[in-house]
Amino acid sequence: MSSQPAGNQTSPGPTEDYSYGSWYIDEPQGGEELQPEGEVPSCHTSIPPSLYHACLASLSILVLLLLAMLVRRRQLWPDCVRGRPGLPSPVDFLAGDRPQAVPAAVFVVLFSSLCLLLPDEDPLPFLTLASAPSQDGKTEAPRGAWKILGLFYYAALCYPLAACATAGHTAAHLLGSTLSWAHLGVQVWQRAECPQVPKIYKYYSLLASLPLLLGLGFLSLWYPVQLVRSFSCRTGAGSKGLQSSYSEEYLRNLLCRKKLGSSSHTSKHGFLSWAWVCLRHCIYTPQPGFRLPLKLVLSATLTGTAIYQVALLLLVGMVPNIQKVRAGVTTDVSYLLAGFGIVLSEDKQEVVELVKHHLWALEVCYISALVLSCSLTFLVLMRSLVTHRTNLRALHRGAALDSSPLHRSPHPSRRAIFCWMSFSAYQTAFICLGLLVQQIIFFLGTTALAFLVLMPVLHGRNLLLFRSLESSWPFWLTLALAVILQSMAAHWVFLETHDGHPQLTNRRVLYAATFLLFPLNVLVGAMVATWRVLLSALYNAIHLGQMDLSLLPPRAATLDPGYYTYRNFLKIEVSQSHPAMTAFCSLLLQARSLLPRTMAAPQDSLRPGEEDEGMQLLQTKDSMAKGARPRANRGRARWGLAYTLLHNPTLQVFRKTALLGANGAQP
């Protein structure tokens, strides 16, 4: 009974194993994990990132301490000759004569580091982020709190990079050169050893770090150049203080007579002149005698960096996945579509080609929407710079941009200071969110246009939109006729002109038509309301990053946080860094410093500690100033008159030497 028939016995040879473990022939042997095709393996540098960051953090702290020894606080200790060590300022935001390229580069480095922090698993690399192992044996650590600490860490790490430029000392330039080269060397070393990473996209880390490398490269070149200049000239570059070319250029441009363009030139080149005027109103072009404040320069630089970073993230997060899906389409997709009742063709290979073609069209729509979003955001940025310049010039002249009594006061307030501090950060966040919203809207619009209009017309199939229009054409024709007939009747029947004044006529017919067409106008109003919603959404999405424009009506403009921040930002900028006020304070301080030392050589620049003193010079309230106010006011008025008469170009032709020279007489 236990024996089996001979026919069921197999021939001698290698026995076949039908166990479950041998069913998957692609399973790696020996417990090895098979790397999926196209996936980038994890890359580890020869030197761990924790050591990199520990060295950079230590070097930054050392540089900050040395800078604190160089920068002395004379205000709190006026009797002490050497002063007390103080924390150096990273950026002089309200100093209009400082170099603007270094703060812009530092902020680009900081923002790019924060963008790389988002997908990073170790926000603080020099700390061990480990927790108790989970049930599957893998360690899991909460990353949210560490990422928040990472925000402060990278800001503190970039602090000495910016502070070395404001110290105005040869040793500070040497420290800045060392620190910038250390940062650049670490970044280049990491990207050279691990150009590909498995996060988001294999080249995302390399592409996202390009602004970071550009900013560090600029700093690593700028600091050595300033160091060489300081050794050659024996003066720290960038320490001119208030006496600089910008204030003088602003006053010169303000006092000189404006030249009027000839009408013949305009008529001869009418189209070119009109195009140039339109270009100047839409795109920012530098003009002599005016320089944008540092905060606006930082906002523009961060906006460009944010456009690049967000566009890169949207591009590498979507396009490679679409390409992988298109490359992996097989004939099985026909069964998947048939399950949803979609039959593209009886031929399975033709279905594969159609699906690949549709995926390619989807990729084209996505890239087109991204290009359109970036272009519109960049144009809005250029238009905003023109508006900033116009508003600042108006405020410099003493004009008011709105009728609100809150913004008429020139004095700073607590809310205004807070808005000034957060302006550049708000601008960057608005640009990022606005670009994301624009990408969604434009992608949906281009996809609907491609799949409902263009591709059905080209291929002659899937005419869903045209079939729906064919079935509902009486409805749309009725609405169109109602609109056209009312417009024609309003122009030819219900309106006539008497003595050059238009007047209503045929009022009975007008009342009857209004009553009878009310149901149709309700339907037309529904279509108009839909169009209004779409148009307002598109307009607000495009102008979301434009803080100088309120997205709310004028009566509710103060409820717009972006517009409110912008108005208070302008108040602080105009009240604290007016170029004319800066120039006059500089001249007064020079006269005050040269008064007790008549025989001494004139100074070419002011000490860095005298800038705040000059800002408060016109606002002194001591008893001696109150007693000598009439005499001081009279002397100040005479000095202003003399300065104007000497430096006004329009009055030079009326001087004695010029008149004698014109008459041919000897002076």
UniProtKB/Swiss-Prot annotation:
Entries under InterPro entries matching the protein: STRA6-like
Stretches for region Interaction with RBP1: 235-293
Major subcellular site: membrane
Intramembrane residue segments, as ranges: 510-547
Record membrane topology: Multi-pass membrane protein
Residue spans crossing the bilayer: 51-71, 99-119, 145-165, 169-189, 206-226, 296-316, 368-388, 423-443, 474-494
Modified residues (Phosphotyrosine): 643
Swiss-Prot/TrEMBL keywords: Cell membrane, Glycoprotein, Membrane, Phosphoprotein, Receptor, Retinol-binding, Transmembrane, Transmembrane helix, Transport, Vitamin A
Name the record gives this protein: Receptor for retinol uptake STRA6
Source lineage: Eukaryota, Metazoa, Chordata, Craniata, Vertebrata
